[in-house]
Every structure is written in structure tokens, then in C-alpha cells.
């Protein structure tokens, strides 16, 4: 009967032409050009282990980049945990870019948590709590487990209904699921709670999934490559049909931070019994504080997993920019946090010289108490010269896909050398808009000159403010 219906449908479709519909192309994703989009790494020579003058989007600051590469190597060898580094130098000398390049050199496997010192201060959460959260975000845990799973291509997915005694109609009593591999197939009778997870992941016949035998967690791997020739508007990942038996032992590796474990255990849900269940309980972080007692219990469990070989600790990097904004209470807390057994590498950055320590009143180098300075490895950065600024501007114009006339680019480089590099970088986008307004794609001298007159730099703004202060006020 079904075959007859299919033939009838195919017959009618051949006699009538389907209407032609225009397929609209998917909108091109706009890639945002950030301040350090051109930085791709530290630019270190693999043979000499020294930084190239110009490499990986970086120009100059070779000694600082070489020192940062040594810190990266120490982090990889896990002999840097609990130590701190300070990147100190004038404004616009590449301090944040060096920290970003360090994270790119470390890769995705090592946690990298950026934090601005002003983010520590909040009316809802204590300063020490914000620092502790950041510390635990920067400490990763790689969990390795061998689990009993059912894996294969879905060939049957049938929920079985049964009458409800409460008179509310029919409910799903169990789920019949058939999985197929290259070696054989198996039919499973599953709990109805698993059906909800299957619906959420939109599992259908032809998908490759695996189900953990202990916890019942369902994971959709992808679409079986047998259906790769089918026309589908949605881009899907095609995977080969699993080999071996349907029921097998599988090694599962999951990366999670200590902060994720804190949040997952603050309001535990689901079944207990193994690490993956704890990882699966991750939810949206709350603004309330996690108790020290809970953290100590999690640390005990983590230490047990590490000793038994189930998990591996991955100390990451916590980058705190504008560290001079921290007060003496934060620094006092950092003394103890850096000495704890579970501590990441902390990288500070500041552009201040000798300034007042907040909450203390005394002046100190970089606004950091002397007790903390003794614990730091300090990496200095130097001011860029005119040639460095010119090459940095070349990298930025290439990243932003902007074309300059040679004389206009000379003027922009001169502005960067005389005023500031950041001011010159900020003039690129307005100059392009001025050129486009005049119907040109190439930026000329008049475009750069117009932008310098429309937008003041820091020095001109300060000079104008001082002149206004000296002018006598008109009495009413």
C-alpha cells in the first residue's frame, strides 16, 4: 500500500513541474578586526630559540618575546605553576599582544583566562571571590575514563506508549532503539528519560550515536557517511559507520576547569558515580559565592583522581591586565593563592612607573607592594621607534585590507612617531571612510590630514584643557 502511494506521488510529480525557487546564499559571516588580530604568535626561531625582529605579526620587542617564550616552555613542562610574571612598559608597547601571543603558543589544551583588574571590584561578589574564580578557571583537568558504551548507526527509533493509570492519557513506557555497526546490530530497550535527550539532540534514523551504559548519557556523533550523497540544506558532519560490536569499551577524554566543577557541584543534578556525570552537570554560572568547604571537597576528589591516574592536572595562565588597579587586600590574597598547591601561572601587565599602591597610600614601583615584586619575574618592554611603528602600521593595514597612497602612509607613520602608535592606528578606519566618501578606495594625504584635524590626540586634548583652565571665567 505504501509502495502504491509512493508511485502515485512520483507520477503526479513527473506530470507537473515544480515551481522554480531562488536559493538565497547564506550571509557571509563578518569577521571582526580586533586590536591584535594581526598577532599570530611570538615569532620564535626554532633553531636559535630567539625572537625574530619581525615575525608572526610582531615587530620589535625581541628580548621581551624571547623571555615570554621561555615562560611558555616552562608552562608546557609544568614547572612554572604557582609563579608570577610581570610585563611592564610604557603604553602601546605590546604588553597585551605578548600575553595574547603566549596563549596562542600554548594552544587550546592549556587554559588561558584574561582579566582586567577593575573587574575584581563588584557590589555582589567579594574581591577575593572574583580572584579565586579566575584562579580556578585557569586550572584545567583532563579526565580520562574507559566506559562501557553502545555505539552505532540508528536504524530504528520507536517510542512505545502505554496507558496512564492517572487518566491523563498515554505516556511513553520505553524506547526501542536499534543500532548497527559494520560487524552486527543490536536492539535496545531504553528508559523513557533517554528519549528526551534524543529529542533535544534531534537524533534520527541514519545518525551515529553512542550511549553510556552506566549513566545513559546520549551523544550524537554525526550523520553516517552512507547518506553523504543526499541533498540536505543543513550542513552536517558525516562520520563513518562504527566498526566492531555495538557494545564496546571506549576511552573518553574530557577537559574541564576546577571552576566548572565548583559550579556543577553547587547544585548537583542527575546521577552520581563517575567524573563524566559531574562534567555533564555544568550549568550557567551564578553570581553567588561557592563555599570554601565545597572547594576543599572538590580538591580532595580531584587529588584522588590524579593519584589514581584517572585525571591529569593542567595548570594554565591567568592574565591580569592593569595590575596597578588592584588594592592591598587583593595583593595580600594573591600571596597565599600563589603558594597553594593548585595554582596557575599568573601574568601581570602594567604601564605605570612609580605610583601609589591602592589602599596603602605608599608609593611603589608599578603600584605593586614590594613583597609582591620580590615574587615576580619582570619582563620589560621598550618604546617603538619610527621604523617599528611603520612596520606595525603595514601589518594593520593588511589585516584591515586598507590601501594607502605612499605619501599618505608616510604621513600616518609620522603621526604615529610624533604622537602615539594607538592614535595612528585609530585613524586608519576614519581615513578609509573619508576616501570612500570621495569615491576612492585608496587613501590619500588629504584623507589622513582631514582626520588629524577632526580627531585630537591625547597631547592636543590635554593642551586644550589646560588653556581653558587658564582662561578667566566670566562673572554673571
From Swiss-Prot:
Does Nucleotide-binding count among this protein's keywords? Answer: yes
InterPro entries registered for this protein in UniProt: AAA+_ATPase, P-loop_NTPase, RuvB-like, RuvB-like_C, RuvBL1/2_DNA/RNA_bd_dom, TIP49_P-loop
The UniProt record gives the binding positions of ATP as 89-96
A Pfam family the protein falls into: TIP49
Q: Which GO terms describe its cellular component?
A: cytoplasm; Ino80 complex; NuA4 histone acetyltransferase complex; nucleus; R2TP complex; Swr1 complex
List the catalytic activities from the record: ATP + H2O = ADP + phosphate + H(+)
Q: Which Gene3D superfamilies match?
A: 1.10.8.60, P-loop containing nucleotide triphosphate hydrolases (3.40.50.300), RuvB-like helicase, domain II (2.40.50.360)
The yes or no answer to whether the keyword Hydrolase is present is yes
UniProt EC number: 3.6.4.12
- A Gene Ontology molecular-function term? ATP binding
Deletion consequences: RNAi-mediated knockdown results in arrest at larval stage L3, with less than 40% forming a mature vulva, lipid accumulation, epidermal granule formation and reduced protein synthesis. There is also gonadal detachment during gonad migration.
Q: Which domain of life is it from?
A: Eukaryota
Provide the alphabetized UniProt keywords.
ATP-binding, Chromatin regulator, Cytoplasm, DNA damage, DNA repair, Helicase, Hydrolase, Nucleotide-binding, Nucleus, Transcription, Transcription regulation
Q: Which segments carry the region annotation Disordered?
A: 1-23
Annotated compartments: Cytoplasm; Nucleus
GO BP annotations of the record are: box C/D snoRNP assembly; chromatin remodeling; DNA repair; nematode larval development; positive regulation of translation; regulation of transcription by RNA polymerase II; TOR signaling
- Tell me the tissue specificity: Expressed in gonadal cells.
Protein family (similarity comment): Belongs to the RuvB family.
Summarize the protein's role: Possesses single-stranded DNA-stimulated ATPase and ATP dependent DNA helicase (3' to 5') activity suggesting a role in nuclear processes such as recombination and transcription. May participate in several chromatin remodeling complexes that mediate the ATP-dependent exchange of histones and remodel chromatin by shifting nucleosomes. Involvement in these complexes is likely required for transcriptional activation of selected genes and DNA repair in response to DNA damage.
Q: How does it assemble?
A: Forms homohexameric rings. May form a dodecamer with ruvb-2 made of two stacked hexameric rings.
Tell me which PANTHER family the record gives: RUVB-RELATED REPTIN AND PONTIN
Q: What is this protein called?
A: RuvB-like 1
Could you tell me which species this protein originates from? Caenorhabditis elegans
Recorded name of the encoding gene: ruvb-1
Amino acid at each position: 500500500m505504501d509502495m502504491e502511494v509512493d508511485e502515485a506521488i512520483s507520477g503526479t510529480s513527473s506530470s507537473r513541474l515544480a515551481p522554480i525557487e531562488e536559493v538565497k546564499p547564506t550571509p557571509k559571516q563578518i569577521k571582526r578586526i580586533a586590536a591584535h588580530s594581526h598577532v599570530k604568535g611570538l615569532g620564535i626561531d626554532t633553531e636559535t630559540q630567539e625572537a625574530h625582529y619581525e615575525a608572526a605579526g610582531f615587530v620589535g620587542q625581541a628580548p621581551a618575546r624571547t623571555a615570554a617564550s621561555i615562560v611558555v616552555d616552562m608552562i608546557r613542562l609544568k614547572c612554572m605553576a604557582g609563579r608570577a610574571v610581570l610585563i611592564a612598559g610604557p603604553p602601546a608597547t605590546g604588553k597585551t599582544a605578548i600575553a595574547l601571543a603566549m596563549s596562542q603558543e600554548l594552544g587550546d589544551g592549556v587554559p588561558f583566562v584574561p582579566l582586567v583588574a577593575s573587574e575584581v571590584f563588584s557590589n555582589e561578589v567579594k574581591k577575593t571571590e572574583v580572584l579565586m574564580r579566575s584562579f580556578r578557571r585557569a586550572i584545567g583537568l583532563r579526565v580520562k575514563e574507559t566506559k562501557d558504551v553502545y555505539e552505532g548507526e540508528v536504524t530504528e527509533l520507536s517510542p512505545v506508549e502505554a496507558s496512564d493509570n492517572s487518566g491523563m492519557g498515554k505516556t511513553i513506557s520505553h524506547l526501542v532503539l536499534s543500532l548497527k555497526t559494520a560487524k552486527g546490530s543490536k536492539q535496545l530497550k531504553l528508559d523513557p528519560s533517554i528519549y528526551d535527550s534524543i529529542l533535544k539532540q534531534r537524533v534520527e534514523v541514519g545518525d551515529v550515536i553512542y550511549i553510556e551504559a552506566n549513566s545513559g548519557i546520549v551523544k550524537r556523533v554525526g550523520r553516517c557517511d552512507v547518506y553523504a550523497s543526499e541533498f540536505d540544506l543543513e550542513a552536517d558532519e558525516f562520520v563513518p559507520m562504527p566498526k566492531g560490536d555495538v557494545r564496546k569499551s571506549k576511552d573518553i577524554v574530557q577537559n574541564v576547569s576546577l571552576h566548572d566543577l565548583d559550579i556543577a557541584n553547587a547544585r548537583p543534578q542527575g546521577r552520581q558515580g563517575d567524573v563524566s556525570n559531574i562534567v555533564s552537570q555544568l550549568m550557567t554560572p551564578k553570581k553567588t559565592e561557592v563555599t570554601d568547604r565545597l572547594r576543599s571537597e572538590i580538591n580532595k576528589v580531584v587529588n584522588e583522581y590524579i593519584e589514581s591516574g584517572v585525571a591529569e592536572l593542567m595548570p594554565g595562565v591567568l592574565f591580569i591586565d592593569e595590575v596597578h588597579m588592584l588594592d592591598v587586600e587583593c595583593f595580600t590574597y594573591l600571596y597565599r593563592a600563589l603558594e597553594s598547591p593548585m595554582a596557575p601561572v599568573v601574568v601581570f601587565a602594567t604601564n605605570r612607573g612609580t605610583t601609589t599602591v591602592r589602599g596603602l597610600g605608599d608609593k611603589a614601583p608599578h603600584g605593586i607592594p614590594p613583597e609582591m615584586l620580590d615574587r615576580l619575574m619582570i619582563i620589560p618592554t621598550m618604546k617603538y621607534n619610527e621604523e617599528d611603528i611603520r612596520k606595525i602600521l603595514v601589518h594593520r593595514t593588511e589585516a584591515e585590507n586598507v590601501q594607502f597612497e605612499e605619501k599618505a602612509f608616510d604621513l600616518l607613520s609620522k603621526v604615529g612617531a610624533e604622537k602615539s602608535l594607538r592614535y595612528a592606528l585609530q585613524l586608519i578606519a576614519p581615513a578609509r571612510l573619508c576616501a570612500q566618501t570621495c569615491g576612492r578606495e585608496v587613501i590619500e594625504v588629504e584623507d589622513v590630514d582631514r582626520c588629524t584635524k577632526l580627531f585630537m590626540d591625547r597631547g592636543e586634548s590635554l593642551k586644550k584643557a589646560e588653556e581653558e583652565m587658564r582662561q578667566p571665567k566670566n562673572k554673571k
